[in-house]
């Protein structure tokens, strides 16, 4: 008989209350910051917009969460909900594409990697979209491209501005040329926005790479980024292996890109609503933001 069993028989109550208290603690109550490794109380993190209160690191968040933080509460219309991805090429790598889609849809409760909502910002109507990075790395396939174009079309029809929060690894390789075509398709749609004189603000969050960074994400009238976001085309390890040189400190971080003129401004998540409203107010002729808003 082990010592632990012997103690449990003599003092059974010593162990049971501890187990009971442990079982009463809900899962996910604490979260570890990936930057400072501090442990943060989940409700506190929620109140702080998923920004670490210890080091100000902007944690990755879902598309729905991001749009909820950005748009006014109230009536919202989702665009492109009837669109679902199709495995036209019967693509298979280590896993069938259709199986990857099923797994991603189950994990995220989304049909694909872009959510588009028509809503309001401080009472002014606009269209906003956000990439869901947890859906196959936020990769852009046919559905993502079509939803984005439909968002643009709504803006053109109703004379509204467009805001896009990008978080993507790039074009979806499982759709091959169908995916690459979305780069041209979304870029052409944004040219129509430009010709119509309607503003498009691109917000680059962590991370934005590949075909998304090489198309719609960098085509904003104003390109905004969250602090410390990774932004580029190829990843830093790939670049280092190609050029056989050590990259500068902070290479591809939003602060580095701002310093070298690749983006226009860095905005904290806490200030995103007010900052983007003021930008759009100047472009759209909206009324100035009231002090109590």
From Swiss-Prot:
Subunit structure: Acetyl-CoA carboxylase is a heterohexamer composed of biotin carboxyl carrier protein (AccB), biotin carboxylase (AccC) and two subunits each of ACCase subunit alpha (AccA) and ACCase subunit beta (AccD).
PANTHER family: ACETYL-COENZYME A CARBOXYLASE CARBOXYL TRANSFERASE SUBUNIT BETA, CHLOROPLASTIC (PTHR42995:SF5)
GO biological process: fatty acid biosynthetic process; malonyl-CoA biosynthetic process
Zinc finger regions, C4-type: 33-55
Pathway: Lipid metabolism; malonyl-CoA biosynthesis; malonyl-CoA from acetyl-CoA: step 1/1
Gene that encodes it: accD
HAMAP family xref list: AcetylCoA_CT_beta (MF_01395)
One GO CC term on file: acetate CoA-transferase complex
InterPro entries registered for this protein in UniProt: AcCoA_carboxyl_beta, Acetyl_CoA_COase_Trfase_b_su, ClpP/crotonase-like_dom_sf, COA_CT_N, Znf-ACC
Sites where the protein binds Zn(2+): 33, 36, 52, 55
E.C. designation(s): 2.1.3.15
Name this polypeptide is given: Acetyl-coenzyme A carboxylase carboxyl transferase subunit beta
Stretches that traverse the bilayer: none
Subcellular location: Cytoplasm
Keywords: ATP-binding, Cytoplasm, Fatty acid biosynthesis, Fatty acid metabolism, Lipid biosynthesis, Lipid metabolism, Metal-binding, Nucleotide-binding, Transferase, Zinc, Zinc-finger
Keyword Lipoprotein: no
Keyword Lipid metabolism: yes
Domain of life: Bacteria
Family: Belongs to the AccD/PCCB family.
């Amino acid at each position: 008989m082990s010592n632990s069993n012997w103690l449990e028989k003599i003092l059974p109550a010593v162990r049971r209350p501890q187990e009971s208290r442990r079982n009463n603690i809900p899962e996910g109550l604490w979260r570890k910051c990936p930057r400072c490794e501090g442990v943060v109380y989940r409700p506190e993190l929620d109140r702080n917009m998923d920004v670490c209160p210890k080091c100000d690191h902007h944690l990755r968040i879902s598309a729905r969460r991001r749009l909820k933080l950005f748009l006014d509460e109230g009536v919202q219309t989702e665009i492109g909900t009837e669109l679902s991805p199709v495995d036209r090429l019967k693509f298979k790598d280590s896993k069938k594409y259709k199986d990857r889609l099923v797994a991603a849809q189950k994990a995220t409760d989304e049909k694909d990697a872009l959510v588009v909502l028509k809503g309001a910002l401080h009472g002014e109507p606009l269209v906003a979209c956000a990439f869901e990075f947890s859906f196959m790395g936020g990769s852009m396939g046919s559905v993502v491209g079509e939803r984005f174009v439909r968002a643009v079309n709504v803006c053109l029809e109703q004379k509204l501005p467009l805001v896009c929060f990008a978080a993507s690894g790039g074009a979806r390789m499982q759709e091959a040329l169908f995916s690459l075509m979305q780069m041209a398709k979304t870029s052409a749609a944004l040219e129509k926005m430009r010709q119509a004189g309607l503003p498009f603000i691109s917000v680059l969050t962590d991370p934005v790479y590949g075909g998304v960074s090489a198309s719609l994400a960098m085509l904003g009238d104003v390109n905004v980024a969250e602090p410390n976001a990774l932004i580029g085309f190829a990843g830093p390890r790939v670049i280092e292996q190609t050029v056989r040189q050590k990259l500068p400190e902070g290479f591809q971080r939003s602060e580095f890109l701002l310093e070298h003129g690749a983006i226009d401004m860095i905005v904290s998540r806490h200030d995103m609503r007010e900052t983007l409203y003021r930008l759009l107010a100047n472009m759209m002729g909206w009324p100035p933001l009231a002090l109590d808003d």
